[in-house]
Amino acid sequence: PEDLELAWNILKGPDKNDRRTPPVRWKIPEQRTMSDYKVAWVPGWKDYETSEQTKQVIQKFIQVIKDQGGNTQQLIPKEDLHRRTLELHQRLSFMTIMQDLPWFVKPLMVKGLKNGYLKGAENIVWKFKDTFSDYSQLIGQRMQIIKEWETYFDDFDLLVCPSGFGPAYKRCKIGTPITYEGKTIKYIDYVYPYNACFNASGHPAISIPLGLGKEGLPVGVQVVGSYWSEPDLLHFAKLVSKHTEGFVKHKPYPI
């Protein structure tokens, strides 16, 4: 966490020559202890469950928080908020990728995505509009979704959730299905659904490494906060790192 904190301190706030963006008065959380945090957690998301090992890793992490005096509660956001945020990311991503491309290039881009990163993906709207009006409508939806997430965080400081279906996986060709615990997962569904939603809403998140799993592969959790909670996330990560394994280098695979 100290390395991340250093990077964040360098990057945070507007450039000194930017006169249009006011500086944020960041809250300083140094005096907070684990007992000052109220933490929500989920073992997975609707339509995107996780492996048994991932659930166990999350539960073990929550127990660490409890043991240090933290307040925890399992609570999934209402109204399919995760699903709608994920759909927003999909539409905004496509609009960003396709903007300003000649009309004859767009089908080639779609074909490349279908045969690569998004191979086998379901519920993808391949035909979409990319006018300024459509973009403005999406931004309006994004503002509403951000509001709903912020309402959720009114009752909690942080949210602990999965960072993927299972542990880190062996490097493979993009689009190759990944099998873990006897279940084969589409390449896009192994990590994307658990992280992209917060990229869409813009909520700060941090990945906390928790050592190695039963196969000797890295495991961890994702912790998300409300807007402007970066100092709290970093402070929480430093507190909890004293009671977890943290990053452990795994043995390299034979070539």
Model-derived regions, located:
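Short, surface-exposed loop/helix-turn segments at secondary-structure junctions
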Residues: 169-191
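Short, well-ordered beta-strand elements
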Residues: 217-226, 233-234
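A short helix-breaking turn/cap at a secondary-structure junction
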Residues: 1-56, 244-255
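Short helix-loop capping/hinge segments that flank enzyme active sites or metal/cofactor-binding pockets
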Residues: 33-42, 91-150, 162-167, 171, ...
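Short gly/ser/thr-rich secondary-structure transition/capping motifs
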Residues: 19-25, 139-147, 187-188
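Acyltransferase
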Residues: 52-77, 105-111, 135-156
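Small-aliphatic-rich amphipathic alpha-helix that forms the alpha element of a beta-alpha
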Residues: 148-151, 186-208
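Short glycine/serine-rich loop segments
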Residues: 1-11, 200, 204-211, 215-220
